[in-house]
């Protein structure tokens, strides 16, 4: 016997796909699919077009690993930014969050993972841009503390100042879950790592 759901394969496939997005549960995925499929198909087409364009044009900056639509991102190519400070973050989305604060006028370096770090390229960048301070903007965890120590050890011969954003960012919490006032206060109160 066929069930009602068996006749809605395409719709249910859309719900399943939407449910794979972080922080979107089954109920939210159903509501989004229903809205896009029945209530606002024009928006669905706009989203489809925006996704195609993003997938076609999105890449990572060859200098800092942040998201970009060109080989070098706007931040790295901006001559007015302070060259003496390099803010290290874990993920490209962290650059968005910190840029929204408008507290940091230097440049960034996105780690993604320690295995992917090209220390030769990073060292070249430290010299070329005359970096004097590395700011670790990582959520406070024991693993991230170890990561900071590892990076400090690898770059100690540059005699840099290493700082980290101040505590006040709760341990184990990602930036997207912190209010902007707390994150701004923590960033402006950074301390020597």
Curated annotation (Swiss-Prot):
PROSITE patterns xref list: RECR, TOPRIM
Record keywords: DNA damage, DNA recombination, DNA repair, Metal-binding, Zinc, Zinc-finger
Single GO term (MF): DNA binding
All residue ranges annotated as the Toprim domain in the record: 84-170
Gene3D superfamilies: 3.40.1360.10, RecR Domain 1
Listed InterPro entries: DNA_Rcmb_RecR, Rcmb_RecR, Rcmb_RecR_Znf, TOPRIM_dom, TOPRIM_RecR
Zinc finger (C4-type): 61-76
Single GO biological process annotation from the record: DNA repair
Function: May play a role in DNA repair. It seems to be involved in an RecBC-independent recombinational process of DNA repair. It may act with RecF and RecO.
HAMAP family (alphabetical): RecR
The family this protein is said to belong to: Belongs to the RecR family.
Record-given protein name: Recombination protein RecR
Gene: recR
């Amino acid at each position: 016997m066929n069930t009602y759901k068996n006749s809605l394969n395409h719709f249910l496939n859309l719900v399943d796909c939407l449910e794979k997005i972080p922080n979107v549960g089954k109920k939210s995925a159903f509501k989004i699919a229903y809205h896009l499929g029945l209530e606002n198909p024009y928006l669905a087409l706009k989203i489809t077009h925006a996704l195609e364009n993003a997938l076609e044009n999105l890449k990572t900056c060859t200098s800092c690993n942040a998201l970009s639509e060109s080989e070098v991102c706007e931040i790295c190519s901006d001559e007015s930014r302070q060259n003496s400070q390099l803010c290290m973050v874990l993920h490209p989305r962290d650059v968005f969050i910190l840029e929204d604060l408008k507290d940091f006028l230097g440049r960034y370096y996105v780690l993604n993972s320690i295995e992917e770090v090209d220390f030769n390229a990073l060292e070249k960048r430290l010299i070329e841009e005359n970096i004097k301070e590395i700011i670790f903007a990582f959520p406070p965890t024991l693993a991230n503390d170890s990561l900071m120590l590892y990076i400090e050890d690898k770059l100690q011969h540059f005699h840099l100042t290493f700082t980290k954003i101040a505590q006040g960012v709760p341990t184990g919490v990602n930036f997207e879950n912190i209010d902007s006032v707390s994150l701004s206060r923590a960033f402006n109160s950074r301390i020597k790592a």
